[in-house]
Amino acid sequence: IRDRLNITENIFERNLSKRGDKTAIIWEPNDPKESPIYLSYKELYEQTCTFSNALRSKGIKKGDRVIIYMPMVPEAAIAMLACARVGAVHSVVFAGFSAASLADRINDCEAKMVLTSDGNFRGNKTIPVKDVVDEALEKCSSIESVIVLERTKQNINMEDGRDSWWHECIEDQPKTCDSEVMDSEDLLFILYTSGSTGK
């Protein structure tokens, strides 16, 4: 029997009525100056739906490939859930990989979009994440859009017509979103090996 269901329904529709106010995600920062973030099932659902609508507004649809090249922040989980909600195939790439390794993965899966951040904090250093994406995309032809999470507030290049800020994309988006009906054999994500080429 080939069942049809969106995996996010097992997280949200199944749990919202009974566990809506219960904690779904606890994010602990590395930097003691930052505060932990607690998201309830209801908050996670609303943020996932808001970003799902943003993805659809950018033309992302069932079967499209989306690269997630982000630090370990709550928005990374939201990005994965939003991709699943709209039926897009996500591929998480460690945000410490080089531009060449990122480009290899983008080209291999023929991704249409990259989700990233302006930068990341690692110890006392600020890592220029978006710069790595820009360098990688010089070798990629499939990417149509890039959504950038403002994490470090450092100055970065934003290419007109391609790059958008996360907070601007979700502005005025509804907090509900119909899930894409998926077949049990449909692809959910692509996870490459940790080698330099991922093959």
Model-flagged regions — what are they?
Residues I26-E28, Y69, L115, L149, ...:
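Short hydrophobic segments within beta-strands
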Residues T8, D21, I25-L81, S98-A103, ...:
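Conserved AMP-binding/adenylate-forming core of the ANL superfamily
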Residues I7, Y38-L39, M182, L188:
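A broad, structural micro-motif
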Residues E13-R19, I106:
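Short glycine/proline-enriched loop/turn "hinge" motifs that connect secondary-structure elements
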Residues I1-N10, E28, R151:
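Flexible, non-catalytic linker and terminal segments flanking ANL/adenylate-forming cores
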Residues V66, C83, L187, T193-S196:
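Conserved S/T- and glycine-rich ATP-binding loop of Class I adenylate-forming
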Residues R85-E168:
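Structural core segment of the AMP-binding/adenylate-forming
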Residues G20-T23, V146-V148, E159-Y192, K199:
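Conserved pre-ATP/AMP-binding loop-to-beta segment of ANL
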